Amino acid sequence: MSKRKSSSILDFFKKSNNGKNMWGNEAVSVEKTDSTTKPSTVKNAISSSQIKNEKFSQEVLLQFNDPSFTSEVGESPQWQSFGDANILEPLKNELVKNEESTMSELLLCPICGITLESLTVDANIHVNDCLDGRTTEAVSKKLKKDSVVKADPSNSSTFPISDSCKQALLPLPGKQINVRSVVPFYKLMPYNIPFAVDAFAYGAIDGVEAYFLSHFHSDHYGGLTPKWKHGPIYCSEVTGNLLINVMHVDEQYVKRLKLNQPYNIMGITVYVLDANHCPGSAMFVFETLQSNQTRRVLHCGDFRASKDHVMHPVLREKTIHKVYLDTTYLNPKYTFPPQADVVQACADKAISIKKSTDSRLLVVVSTYSIGKEKVAVAIAKSLSSRIYVVPRKMHIIKQLENQDLIDLLTDDPTQASVHMVTMMGIHPNSLLDYLEQYNSSFDKIIGYKVTGWTFQPLENRAQLSSSLDSIISRPPKFVEYDLRAIRGSTDKVAAFVAPYSEHSSFYDLTMFCLSMNIGHIIPTVNVGSQRSREKMNVWLDRWAWRRKKQGLLSLENVDW
């Protein structure tokens, strides 16, 4: 494959902003039981063995230039207003500050399998070049001996362990380590269902006969390589395309499932539902019999909850005995607005700027390897423009089975007013450098950093956030005026932050969990510290208490 003309784009977007100018647990069970049954307490919500296993919950694998873990779940900065000019500047992320777990796992390239720890080039660039069939640097494939703890000799795989946990996991003389004992409990399905979800970093897991992948983001497929041979991988059709044609996993192991259809897999009824996260993202519903009674499990993967989920025939008016919940934003401060509002605001802002000047405007939208395409598409349609992407991104998008998006793409950056790029951040200085590449075609540039961390609630909403009634009755709204520029923006170069997320907001989580008949909720994100778990348990218990006392929330006349 020929060398990409815009291969230096990553360098542009790693620069910091120095500009001076400014722009205008498990929740208590609520199944039908004897009225004298007392709800579980927070203290007993998580067992000590579960807490021990949670140390392995963060699989930080920066692959495919995909910041899905670091920018959405930890290291992306929040923002605060600067003076009275409605400008934003970075604010230290309180969630990161309070998080006690500092997991640092061994990073492996999913294509060639080498360790990425000692590369002199950016790890993301190396992986991207591997995807394009090129290698940026000759490196040894031999892993560091002190970076891996081997499992049972009968299991040919190894699994990465953080330095802080290594000593505690070294086997005693004559003892073997059971791989299953170090897999986070929330990745293993209950009721003797022999399935694991998003658990590819642990080799062959004892008792697991099938592996499920919720979506194609690196914090979920981490550990999966072309050499995978530990069992069938069940996923959506789009995710299957990506595994086979992008990651080159052996097709015999990839089992692509259609949405909304029942499958009998090893005696378990399985449904795949659209998770409303990134293209191909899936929620899994598992149904099994236990003591002649149906037990139903919902694993949400990463999802943006919506009314469509609650009203789905597979879930509507059903008892969901266990829900494995994406708790990325289980905090009242993250009651950010609906996707559609933010997408429209971004498009309206681009139109307003375009109409206010005779300049040739270039719009840059930050995306993941997959995900957040909706923003770029809306802007492109509003400007009657095509969308430029690099060859690697083009190849990935062609696996998504979205012909409308494919028809908008071009590999000529001068023929598109919208550029969709994968990067770690957008700042005025880096945008200026990017503009200089194409100064013969464009003379003004704006960029959008789209992430839920950017949302700042109104003061009165923050004060009312402790009331469930207030949360339910005050759905967040968002318009063009609410878009704020990052400090350092000028008339020529401006960077905006938009509270667009493909994870559920706190409002979404509240509506979802109050309107469904849920037995137990098991968080799958931010479970690495006792403090974080206790904070989440407060809300899980409040939701459960409300369901028990007031019944399920009706969505009949709710616009959500």
Swiss-Prot record:
InterPro entries assigned: DRMBL, Rad18_UBZ4, RibonucZ/Hydroxyglut_hydro
Record flagged with keyword Magnesium: yes
Zn-finger region bounds: UBZ4-type: 106-135
PROSITE patterns cross-referenced by the UniProt entry: ZF_UBZ4
Cited Pfam families: DRMBL (PF07522)
Keyword Membrane applies: no
Sites where the protein binds Zn(2+): C109, C112, H126, C130
Alphabetical keyword list: DNA damage, DNA repair, Exonuclease, Hydrolase, Magnesium, Metal-binding, Nuclease, Nucleus, Zinc, Zinc-finger
Cellular component, GO annotation: nucleus
EC identifiers of the protein: 3.1.-.-
Subcellular location: Nucleus
Enzyme class name: hydrolase
GO process annotations (BP): DNA repair; double-strand break repair via nonhomologous end joining; interstrand cross-link repair; nucleotide-excision repair involved in interstrand cross-link repair
GO molecular function annotation: 5'-3' DNA exonuclease activity; damaged DNA binding; zinc ion binding
Source species, domain of life: Eukaryota
Predominant location category: nucleus
UniProt similarity note: Belongs to the DNA repair metallo-beta-lactamase (DRMBL) family.
Role noted for this protein: Required for DNA interstrand cross-link repair. This requires cleavage of cross-linked DNA to generate DNA double strand breaks (DSBs). This protein may have 5' exonuclease activity on single-stranded and double-stranded DNA, which could be necessary for the processing of DNA double strand breaks prior to religation.
Name this protein carries in UniProt: DNA cross-link repair protein pso2/snm1
